[in-house]
UniProtKB/Swiss-Prot annotation:
Keywords: Cell membrane, Membrane, Transmembrane, Transmembrane helix. It comes from the Archaea. This is Uncharacterized protein AF_1569. The chain crosses the membrane at residues 9-31, 84-106, 126-148, 153-175, 196-215, 230-252. It is found in: Cell membrane.
């Protein structure tokens, strides 16, 4: 219980740093946004209790609607708050996709396992929706937060989409084979490692806060800029780690087949 509360506090802190120094919002706005998004993620977690179900479970149209509505609530909230604070449409899109693609999916291990395990039972229209969000959302995020260049952002978005597809293709083949093993040869083992890696993000919030205090005391604005670049580097490092883990999943699947 204490660990979960601490994680929530660190998550709020990390988001606060993001809004304050990357999105350039005010202190009160950043704090409010951080709390709102953490609460939204908790609501989303409650809606996804059915994540405990295994591959034999088939989603009903009502449950698919719940997923879409819960995700849309995060996205619409991003747009609304951005407009209220005087932001541009691109900023609203970037914030919305950022929380869908990078925070919500990787923050919740149950969500990740549900997506992978229930992949064969998902309605095709829902899969298209997922794919579209990953491709377009990743491109927008890379453009707004990392590169600022359209071509580079499109390439990075396509690579992210390719990883998304390869992971699900690996898992689909593995799930439909009916063979599950609790070892490193199980692709899900690698997916859990991704989640644990992403959860290290709150530690960046602590480091960013320390950097901010140091910057204010020494009046060195470059330290704040360093914090922003650290955040951007974290996004890129995440993609690199996912690449490595995807390769590991593929090799693990091959080893398991030979065994």
């Amino acid at each position: 219980m204490l660990r979960k509360k601490l994680l929530k506090i660190l998550s709020v802190l990390t988001l606060f740093i993001f809004f304050q120094y990357v999105a350039k919002f005010g202190i009160l706005e950043s704090l409010a946004l951080s709390i709102v998004y953490v609460l939204l993620m908790e609501i989303l977690r409650d809606l996804e209790i059915l994540a405990e179900k295994r591959v034999t479970y088939k989603l009903s149209s009502t449950e698919v609607t719940k997923y879409v509505v819960s995700e849309a609530s995060i996205f619409v909230t991003s747009l609304a708050i951005t407009f209220l604070l005087g932001g541009e449409i691109l900023d609203g899109l970037a914030f919305g996709f950022f929380f869908l693609v990078y925070l919500q999916w990787f923050y919740n291990e149950a969500e990740m396992e549900r997506v992978f395990n229930d992949f064969p039972t998902f309605p095709k229209i829902f899969l298209i929706y997922r794919f579209a969000i990953t491709l377009f959302g990743s491109t927008i995020c890379f453009y707004r937060f990392v590169f600022g260049d359209v071509l580079k952002s499109i390439v990075a978005g396509i690579l992210t989409f390719a990883l998304f597809l390869s992971q699900r293709a690996l898992n689909l083949e593995y799930v439909t084979s009916g063979k599950f093993v609790r070892s490193v040869s199980n692709p899900q083992w690698y997916f859990r490692r991704v989640k644990h890696f992403i959860l290290s993000a709150p530690a960046m919030g602590v480091g960013a806060t320390a950097g901010y205090i140091a910057a204010r005391s020494a009046e060195i604005e470059s330290i704040i800029e360093t914090v922003c670049w650290t955040f951007r580097a974290f996004l890129l490092l995440t993609i690199v780690v996912v690449c490595i883990l995807t390769l590991g999943s593929w090799l693990g699947l091959k080893v398991h087949k030979k065994a």
